[in-house]
Amino acid sequence: MQAFLSGRRLAATLSCAALAVATAFAASGGSRAVPDLLAQPAQANVRAAASLQLSVTRAGKRLVSVGERGLVLLSDDDGRSWRQAREVPVSVALTQVRFVSETLGWAVGHSGVVLHSADGGETWQVQLDGMKAAALIADAAKAGAASGDPAALKHLREAEGLVQDGPDKPFLGLHFADAKRGWVVGAYGLALATTDGGKTWQSLMGRIPNPGGKHLYAVRQDAGSLLVAGEQGVLFRSGDGGASFEKIPTPYAGTFFGALPVGAHGLLAYGLRGNAWRSDDAGAHWSRIELARAVTLTAALRLADGALLLADESGRLLRGDATATRFVPLAAPLPAGLTAMVQAADGALVASGARGVSRIEPATLTAEAQK
């Protein structure tokens, strides 16, 4: 019951896209269903291309999308057609996918699962699950608590709770800098790192100043800094590859679903109810970007020409210049429930969402909506 309630509490904080992920978990019966889902390979599905897809990325020229029930979709024609991956060993919802080359990629999802592919997404292997992740976090917390520091002791109690709950906590974001160095973050402050391509993992939870275990939705590295975004307006930054983190003060108390660097020292953070905030000085000062609608922003993307795209859960696209000072709506909408975006090799925009994966032709990415 505790796992079920945890899933429902998580669901209450998420946007349309992530809400679907949490709801799928709660409906599965919580931790009681987790072992079966971790052991059950994803099934062939004739409607896979129209299923809930939660993330999409590039693997060289190939596109890879992941979503509900362990479904992984591949496209070799810039998103015009899709087919299922040959082998996915789990049936849990997969929440994000990233590749560092044409062949090497990782995906994360429910039940603390981390998957790895070495063949461009055709087949996948489990590198980590929730039970192993909880044990790693608890071991690190025990070592940190040996000093008797009150904060470390509190972290130990929280880590022991993760072990007792079982593998019911989802990873929600990941980033790999190369074939070796990667980071994953998730619900209740989950955060781990690897330096050997996922063969072994280390807890980051004692390094991130995140008391109370706020949900962490995104992690990315750009311009030498590692950025983590989460609920209650939290942003964390590491300039040393994750060895230490500092909290970036923000004026917003709601959820950030992502953040990305802008210019030499700028930041763009986006999240619930149309909140988009910009800083020119690495987070020392912030100004709100006016977007006209209070609709949750679910994805952001830097295009090949340097322009920035924001997308909200209604499917509206907004285009801004490289400085992110102003965004204008585009004429071409996407289906509601958009979860992620990527630019295909031919310049088209490809987006994952509640209705599968959509494609927008390159010419429409500059056409502004009529006022």
Language model features by range: what are they?
Residues 2-14:
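Bacterial N-terminal signal peptides that target proteins for export
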Residues 2, 25-371:
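Residue-level hotspots at or immediately adjacent to binding/recognition sites across diverse folds
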Residues 12-23:
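Bacterial N-terminal signal peptides
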